[in-house]
Amino acid sequence: MTSPLCWAAASNAMPSQDQISTPSKVKATQVQLKPYRSRGKGLVPVWHSLHSKAGPLHASEGKSAVNMQVAELQRKIQLLEGDRKAFYESTQWNIKKNQETINQLREETRVLQLQLTALLQGDEKVVQAVIREWKSEKPYLKNRTGQQALEHLDYRLNEKVKQLNALRHQLGLRQKWLEELQLQHSLRELEIAEAQDSNTEVAKTMRNLENRLEKARMKAEEAEHITSVYLQLKAYLQEESLHLGNRLDFMEAEVVRTKHELEELHLVNQEALNARDIAKNQLQYLEETVFRERKKRERYLTECKKRAEEKKLQNERMERKTQREHVLLQSDDTLQDSMYSKEEELKRRWSMYQMEVLFGKVKDATGVAETHAVVRRFLAQGDTFTQLEMLKSENEQTLLRLKQEKQRLQQELEDLKYSGEALLVSEQKRQAELQGRLKMEEQRRADAQNQLDRTMRALQITKEGLEHLAGKLNHIVVAGPTYEEGSPGASLDTKGSATPQPQETGRSVGKMDPKVDDYLPNLLGLVEEKLLKLHSQLENHNVPEMLRHIVDLEFYATLEGKLPSYNTRIALPVAGHKDKFFDEEESEEDDSDVVTRAALKMRSQKLIESRSKRRGRSRRS
């Protein structure tokens, strides 16, 4: 650590560490460190030249110290970079969280403003809210002011209180009657216990008899079950026995026909095997014969070639000898004669060569090597021609005889057309036609069955859809034939007591019998009437305002669904407006938990079901 380079690096590193506080400063430090490194590298040879007598020990120590300083500075820079990234991520997360809080507060502010406007609208708003909530009271509250609506509701409330008091009175009477019946039951049980204690033998006998009776009943049920199974088996076997004879005959005929076919195939197979063996033997004999003939021809050709070569050499020697003799004694006249003789000799040799070529082609065509054999072959061609002419005449006579036989057989076939065999053939053809028609009819039946199945499925889907729609529209009452349960003008409560109720006219799905043939048309008519009534009721409402409200809700739900997965919802302890239909028992979940979209849908569904149940109970009461 005694080198000036180390002191310079240390002095430059200390202010750089003090200056690092932000990501921009980190980059500045990195820029500042680069010249120091290059400067240090440039100073090393100078220091070495100045202190060359000290040896390489001081130089190596200086380099290691500089490297350590640089490595330490790099680690610090990396730590500062990590701190910068963490600070940036935490800042972004705080920004997103604050943005979510702002959006939530805006939504709550909008809801509170809507509630405030709803509260400031007065009596007309109250009347409209009551009409929307209680559709059964709509005809009575439609054209009334707030005070008149309150008076009407007070009157109805007094009626309901009176009915409640009457029901409570009936409940007290029923409870007293129930207590009396329980007392009588306990007395009867005491009497039975005393009888069992006094007559133990009789009780044992009764229990034994009951056990035997139960066993006999179980055995009888099992016997009935076994009897029914055996009867089913008997009916199935009887039905099978009706077609068993025909099936056995058909199967026997099939077996006989298959046996005949098998025998014929065995014969054909044996003939084919014999023909194959004969063909193999003939092929082997022909191959051996051809091989021997080829060997013979090759030997003869080699001998002929040798003889031709020898003759050629002899001719060449004779020509050279004659040429030498003629050269010594030639003259002009003798030269012309020799030229003429040479031309004659060349023509003779050319004709001999052509004859040899033709003879070679004839030998190749006939497969014979000797000249006299070729001559015999050509002479034998005449005998072969005459023999072929004889065979031709014989074949023509045979063909004429076969044609006459064919005409005779054709005439016999024409005569046998109306015999038993011809009738059998016609019956077989007719059977084939009927089978074809049967297949066509079966195909038509299968198509009709498929179409019927599709129609039944469509009808079932339509029925289920209409029943579902009718269930949704069950709270709507339409005009129809009157129905009575019990006495006129009275209805039974859950305990079975009769209470005075106004006679109600209307139709509902529960009063229709699904087993009736006209159930589906009646259900369709009922649903149509309810939909028309619902449409007439919707005409009195502000439909664009309702649609705008629904579109706003869907828009907010879409925005909520597009939030990223890492977005966390923070529940703020804000006291919200409690609904008058809010059920405390169904909202016992912890408010600190994160409410997901699925949980919110489940809560809203439960709230809607609780409201519909309360409305149904209020209508039934």
UniProtKB/Swiss-Prot annotation:
The keyword Coiled coil applies. Keywords: Cell projection, Cilium biogenesis/degradation, Coiled coil, Cytoplasm, Cytoskeleton. Residues 61-325, 386-470 form a coiled coil. GO terms for cellular component: axoneme; centriole; ciliary basal body; ciliary rootlet; ciliary tip; cilium; outer dynein arm docking complex. Expressed in trachea multiciliated cells. It is found in: Cytoplasm, Cytoskeleton, Cilium basal body; Cytoplasm, Cytoskeleton, Microtubule organizing center, Centrosome, Centriole; Cytoplasm, Cytoskeleton, Cilium axoneme. Residues 484-514 are annotated as: Disordered. Its main location: cytoplasm. Residues 494-506 have a biased composition (Polar residues). GO terms for biological process: cilium movement; outer dynein arm assembly; regulation of cilium assembly. The keyword Cytoplasm applies. Component of the outer dynein arm-docking complex (ODA-DC) that mediates outer dynein arms (ODA) binding onto the doublet microtubule. Involved in mediating assembly of both ODAs and their axonemal docking complex onto ciliary microtubules. Component of the outer dynein arm-docking complex along with ODAD1, ODAD2, ODAD4 and CLXN. Interacts with ODAD1. Interacts with PIERCE1 and PIERCE2; the interactions link the outer dynein arms docking complex (ODA-DC) to the internal microtubule inner proteins (MIP) in cilium axoneme. This is Outer dynein arm-docking complex subunit 3.
